[in-house]
């Protein structure tokens, strides 16, 4: 992962990691920020929209644009492989898939990606060797577009890629043709390994069933990009077979502290019905919910709207980075470093899953010239935080810098080369603007003015 400018160093709240321009007695300046409860659109999180019934064959640019305009920054990209159960993926298919990712990027969006051989419910999928071959073919396209694929469901197996009802021996139990669980487990492990080998390390691979994750990773320690997707979140006592025991629920609550967890709701799948506002406001943070389908189940989502909690769910889902305070020396001498200490926290339900740095920019009030440095990794911030973490950015003031007053700007752009210069992919902090304090948001540059000034001599 490449970060913007400077060197990368995260500091604890008690540590100092800067060479000050006058360590003896340099006067300092600081400012505090005010949080907001506003629902702020941000990449890699939140309710996800629609991109068409098939991402390759029936892509709907208009649906993606509607999703963006509504404040969503993710769309579901469903890709049918039904025509290739017994064949390699043709070059034309791979080329069109690459073009679809480019179209999503142009729209300022990212995807939660799903490949499946069956979207009818029949479970007509492919053999583990065929799935592995297809993933090997997909690897270059996925790597080239990793910037817009933060999440990918494990997919491929069974009905709707949900890892049940397989006709190829990839599941056992209900609608699985009598396949033994020992055989199914071998097949599932082959597919798991193929996913881990061919999906970019920056993409969270969301597996359907906690029982698989418990089998593979008993202590909840796992590769950094293994996540979970619950296709019947809040459906009832078992979430339609998602959880076979209380221990599975406890495991997932622990597991999701460190990895991505998302899903979609279901229509009255079980009794007692368990999808009210108190349910989502309790289990959303318990399971560290990062993303959720905005189109299904509408009855559940409408219930939240009517009961008044939909906006809270929308704003709290995923990460939510809130600035608390900034402090730095009031003045710096050219040829030295200035340390800008930023206290911030993640008050969202989940962690950030793609690394990105905090960026500090000094902008000359007279000329508009800038100098920039970055530090830290916002994905390391714990979710639902009650206290601040300090990141200190050390910025070198070159001898060529013009003397004068410089505004301090804060930002968190995307870390990928293709999207890091695009403000639509930058994080907007969960802070209210305070124009009278000089704290304003610049949507063009995706920067927040800290309201402090550094004087350079």
Predicted regions and their residues:
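Extracellular/luminal regions of secreted and cell-surface proteins that mediate adhesion/ECM remodeling
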Residues: 314-457
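Boundary/entry segment of secreted carbohydrate-active catalytic domains
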Residues: 28-73, 78-80
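Aromatic-lined substrate-binding rim segments of carbohydrate-active enzymes
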Residues: 61-118, 128-131, 203
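Bacterial N-terminal signal peptides
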Residues: 2-15
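Catalytic-core regions of glycoside hydrolase
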Residues: 151-158, 162, 166-297
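An active-site-proximal structural segment forming one wall of the substrate-binding cleft
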Residues: 93-106, 126-153, 184-198
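Catalytic cores of secreted or luminal carbohydrate-active enzymes
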Residues: 276-328
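Bacterial Sec-dependent N-terminal signal peptides
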Residues: 12-32
């Amino acid at each position: 992962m490449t970060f913007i400018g400077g060197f990368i160093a995260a500091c604890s709240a008690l540590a100092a990691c800067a060479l000050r321009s006058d360590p003896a007695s340099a006067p300092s300046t600081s400012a505090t920020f005010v949080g907001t409860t506003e629902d702020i659109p941000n990449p890699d999180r939140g309710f996800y929209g629609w991109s068409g019934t098939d991402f390759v064959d029936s892509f709907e640019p208009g649906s993606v644009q509607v999703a963006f305009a509504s404040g969503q920054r993710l769309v579901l990209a469903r890709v049918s492989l039904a025509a290739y159960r017994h064949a390699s993926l043709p070059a034309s298919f791979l080329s069109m898939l690459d073009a679809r990712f480019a179209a999503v990027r142009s729209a300022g969006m990212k995807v939660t990606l799903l490949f499946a051989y069956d979207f009818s419910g029949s479970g007509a999928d492919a053999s583990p060797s065929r799935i592995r071959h297809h993933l090997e073919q997909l690897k270059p396209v996925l790597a080239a577009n990793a910037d817009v694929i933060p999440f990918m469901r494990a997919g491929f197996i069974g009905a709707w890629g949900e890892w049940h009802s397989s006709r190829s021996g990839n599941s056992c139990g209900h609608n699985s043709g009598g396949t033994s669980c020992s055989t199914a487990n071998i097949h599932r492990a082959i597919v798991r390994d193929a996913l881990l080998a061919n999906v970019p390390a920056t993409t969270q691979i969301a597996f359907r069933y906690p029982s698989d994750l418990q089998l593979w990773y008993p202590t909840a320690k796992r590769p950094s990009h293994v996540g979970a997707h619950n296709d019947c979140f809040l459906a009832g006592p078992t979430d339609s077979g998602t959880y076979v025991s209380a221990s599975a629920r406890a495991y997932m609550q622990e597991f999701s502290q460190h990895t991505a967890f998302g899903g979609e709701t279901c229509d009255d799948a079980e009794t007692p019905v368990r999808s009210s506002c108190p349910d989502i406001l309790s289990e959303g943070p318990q399971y560290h919910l990062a993303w959720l389908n905005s189109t299904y189940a509408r009855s559940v989502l409408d219930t939240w709207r009517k009961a008044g909690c939909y906006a809270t769910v929308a704003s709290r889902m995923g990460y939510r980075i809130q600035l608390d305070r900034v402090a730095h020396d009031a003045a710096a001498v050219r040829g030295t470093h200035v340390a800008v200490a930023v206290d911030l926290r993640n008050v969202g339900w989940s962690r950030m899953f793609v690394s990105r740095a905090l960026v500090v920019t000094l902008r000359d009030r007279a000329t508009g010239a800038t100098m920039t440095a970055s530090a830290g990794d916002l994905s390391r911030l714990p979710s639902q935080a009650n206290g601040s973490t300090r990141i200190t950015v050390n910025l070198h003031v070159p001898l060529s810098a013009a003397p004068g007053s410089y505004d301090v700007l804060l930002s968190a752009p995307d870390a990928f080369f293709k999207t890091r210069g695009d403000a639509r992919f930058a994080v907007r902090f969960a802070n209210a603007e305070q124009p009278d304090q000089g704290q304003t948001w610049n949507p063009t540059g995706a920067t927040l003015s800290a309201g402090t000034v550094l004087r350079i001599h």
